[in-house]
Amino acid sequence: MPLVILIILFLISNSKKGGKKISSQTLISLSNQDNAFLIDLRESEAFQNGHITNSINIPFNNLANRTNEITQQDKSIILICDMGSVSPNAGEILKKEGFTNVLILKGGINEWRMQNLPLV
């Protein structure tokens, strides 16, 4: 029984890691209100093959060295990766740099595609 409790606690803490997870619809709403700064964490080639409108590409491996490019700290910073598994780690990096309003696209770009939402 203690192992089950540990697993549950791990899953709960991991689900909140890096920032609050949001739906595609919430991302669209925040973006339409001009209240979001979208960061696509995928590699440049994947970004060029299709990304969410108004997102900028800062690959995860470069994020720690490029936080100075995040100029609009008054907006929600929404992190986007392939499946939503890299974004929590990126959120932790941003929180250590002093960013407070970090959000994560639940399911990443794959979930976005599954909902037939547009990419540019």
Residue ranges of model-derived segments:
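Rhodanese-like catalytic fold shared by cysteine-dependent sulfurtransferases
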Residues: 1-24, 33-36, 44-76, 85-120
